[in-house]
Each structure stands twice: as structure tokens, then as C-alpha cells.
């Protein structure tokens, strides 16, 4: 389930973050982004941290 992030989270994570993550960091391809933001492409396999 993906929810709209706050403005600060938007700057960090990109457009969406994964609901239920304690650090509120977005995930790309099932892995948390530790730097940059999550770029959601067309299809989960193409999600990348940028």
C-alpha cells in the first residue's frame, strides 16, 4: 500500500513511500532507499533509488 508522503518525505523519497516502514523511507524493488529518492518506473522491477 502506498500513501502520499509529507513535503519533507517527498524531497527524500520521491512520490511515494511504502506504508508501514518504521523509518518511512521509500523502497525500490523491495529494498529501502538509504540515499537519494525512489524513482517508480513502469513495473516494480524497474524501481530504482536515484
UniProtKB/Swiss-Prot annotation:
The keyword Secreted applies. It is found in: Secreted. GO terms for cellular component: extracellular region. One of its GO terms (biological process) is cell adhesion. Signal peptide: none annotated. Transmembrane segments: none annotated. Its main location: secreted. A motif (Cell attachment site) lies at residues 42-44. Pfam families: Ornatin. Potent inhibitor of fibrinogen interaction with platelet receptors expressed on glycoprotein IIb-IIIa complex. May prevent blood from clotting during either feeding and/or storage of ingested blood. This is Ornatin-E.
